[in-house]
């Protein structure tokens, strides 16, 4: 190839690169301009205004202080001209109809389905996040579907599901959207389920609890250092959340993903079980699940199934009645046993209930098992 042709091809290549860059920059600027138009978004609840158009979000314990143009840690709330806006209201990142057992809820409507939705964002950053593709991104970083609360409830009813589940990412940070959907869902006769990390301030928690039937907490580990190192959050606010949920009468289940060498020590498991029994009672279901390498924690091997089984045994030794296992092949860990007779009350295989021997929440011997059964 002659030098002249080489120069022509080099010039064309440079023009292509520059043109692509200009296009990407213009698209980014278009997004930014749209975001500066408050009419496009829903004003947030739970925030304070300060001098200089600074705001402080009071939805979760991060208590982000934001100058105009700044997003919160959650990537879902933004200060626009001195007001805080939800940037994810009405923007669904994913939606599915799932077995309720998948959440997992084991004491809620066995064998029924939940219309499950999520927006983008999360207010903590777990190194082992299972849904990081939507939880650790901004709303403009992925495709979303616009849907009003009325449309969401309509789709849930049309799907034949008996519940709406706010799940996959962190529903707390789409608080206004969840609240509006939950109100309509309750009025339409649907159950409402939160699958959350529990990182929320008390005032908004107490408001949302008025419209929620079941709350599942993804409890990261009974250790403050683990919370700080692995999630950027803190332990105490989550403990307070669980106490408030229990005191409200809303159904509560707890799940802990066990990670080798991080949150799987016997004393951590025993401490958690004792705390649950002392503060929440012996009938709150506790699930232990097996970790598989994901997101930024790829250098830790999958948790041995024996670790999950041992955690269940320890929690039961401490007096908890309903302790389950997940992500392992261990049938006893998927069965609800009648606490009086020891007989099988509900048998599950993976995400599905294959036998339900309860009658209005009671075993064959008449012993009541707590939960939401109809």
Residue ranges and their predicted role:
Residues 2-65, 262-374:
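Auxiliary Fe-S-binding modules of radical SAM enzymes
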Residues 68-71, 85, 128, 137-140, ...:
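Generic domain-boundary/flexible-linker signal
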Residues 73-83, 87-95, 140-150, 352-365:
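Short cysteine/histidine-rich metal-coordination sites, predominantly Zn2+-binding motifs
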